[in-house]
Amino acid sequence: MNMNSYSCCSSNKKKNVTDLFALLKLVSDNSRLKILCILQKDEHCVCELMKETNLSQSLISHHLRDLKDVNLVSDRKEGNWVHYSLTDEGKRITNLLFQI
């Protein structure tokens, strides 16, 4: 099925379907899902996420950037540290995902 051909949908619905597809593709990654799960409990810095996930700093940073790009995660700087947490949208989406 070609995700760009929607003969039955309005252009607004086409955009919503495309956005939903992109979001589901993003959160279907096991590492990103694990990060979302960890951030659901509290904010964390990259070094804490590294310990929790056994992923490298560069990979965690890459995943966080992707999650920030879709407004699921935000950051807060405190001195030399950056703390990451779920946005309101991130909390809503994460809660929905973990209800499935």
Regions found by a protein language model. Name each.
Residues 16-20, 83-100:
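Conserved segment of winged-helix/HTH DNA-binding domains
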Residues 68-78, 85:
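Beta-hairpin "wing" of winged helix-turn-helix
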Residues 49-51:
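A short acidic, leucine-rich amphipathic alpha-helix
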Residues 30, 41-45:
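Short capping segments at the starts of secondary-structure elements
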Residues 22, 33-37, 92:
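Pre-recognition alpha-helix immediately N-terminal to the DNA-recognition helix
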Residues 63:
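Residues within the DNA-recognition helix of helix-turn-helix
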Residues 5-24:
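Short, Lys/Arg-enriched N-terminal segment that forms or immediately precedes the first helix
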Residues 56-59:
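Helix-turn-helix DNA-binding motif, specifically the short coil turn and the N-cap/start of the second
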